[in-house]
Amino acid sequence: MDPIFQSLQTVVDRYDELNEQLADPEIAGDGQKYMALSKEAGEMRETVETYLHYQQVLQDIADAEDLLDDAEMAPLAKEDLNTLKPEKEALESQLKILMLPKDPNDDKNIIMEIRGAAGGDESSLFAADLLDMYRRYAEKQRWTLSIIDETLTEVGGYKEVAVMITGDNVYSKLKFESGAHRVQRVPATETQGRVHTSTATVGVMPEFQEIDFELAESDLEEEFFRSGGAGGQNVNKVSTAVRLVHKPTGIMVKMQEERTQIKNRDKARKLLASRVYDFYAQQNEAEYAEKRKSAVGTGDRSERIRTYNYPQNRVTDHRIGLTLNKLDRVMNGELGEVIDALVIADQTAKLAELNNA
């Protein structure tokens, strides 16, 4: 028997145990425990229901095969088997995917950082276009996108912008967006009609509250300064902006988006908590630096995960060889086809690793 299926009965047993506990009035009266058990049961529900359906299909196949020796019932049994056997195979594939190890961060909100990189002003404008694309996708998913911090350029683009996206399973869908995004188009400032190539980089991190990871005050170094606007001019005479440094790792964040020092500090701590947690999750500085390099990117034109070709209305994801001739729709937030293909490719790779183990 496939080792994946050997563990399914354990999942069913645990699911039944959880439902018994949830029916206990004593547990129902403990809100925090009840919510934790409900969440665990909810995460198992699809797997259990699919497995029970699979078991029923196996039984139906066995019953139909028993009827093949009955001259009168054999034609109907064969007809049933023609339907049941493909259904069995489809359910087996579905169960293998459901039983893949879950990314513990998949249900988390995210912090996304977008930076204009190679290409000057045009790269900052493309960074703004990427933000609009993700904003529209978030709206279609009924998520909420809010800007944490931004540094505008004089042409109306972003040197860098950090946003928080909250909703259901945000990280699971957007974690593959990390990397360098290349655009090929004629800039608005181009008088000769020549196509230019520019790059913006995207970094995606799961959001970690301090309930997940505590930042010790003794490990923090903070500095308050005046908020600045585009071009570096001061727009606030009061020191409301904050810079936080996590001394053990050297990770630094600054926040000036809000009008008050308290709000800026709160946002800065959230961003810092995510970055520090991410750092320790990588085990050591070398792994962290390599991951950040591959996630956020250096901005070099040759380092890319996706190309957006405006003259040909084409978007290509180089990691999986996917090309779609509907860039206009993708930029309007219709990212589902790209994201679904990336998720399937990731699942396929994990299944191959599991089968080869």
Swiss-Prot record:
The modification N5-methylglutamine is found at residue 233. Keywords: Cytoplasm, Methylation, Protein biosynthesis. The keyword Protein biosynthesis applies. Pfam families: PCRF, RF-1. Belongs to the prokaryotic/mitochondrial release factor family. It comes from the Bacteria. The keyword GTP-binding does not apply. SUPFAM superfamilies: Release factor (SSF75620). This is Peptide chain release factor 1. Peptide chain release factor 1 directs the termination of translation in response to the peptide chain termination codons UAG and UAA. Methylated by PrmC. Methylation increases the termination efficiency of RF1. The gene is prfA. Signal peptide: none annotated. It is found in: Cytoplasm. Coiled coil: none annotated. One of its GO terms (cellular component) is cytoplasm. One of its GO terms (molecular function) is translation release factor activity, codon specific. Its main location: cytoplasm.
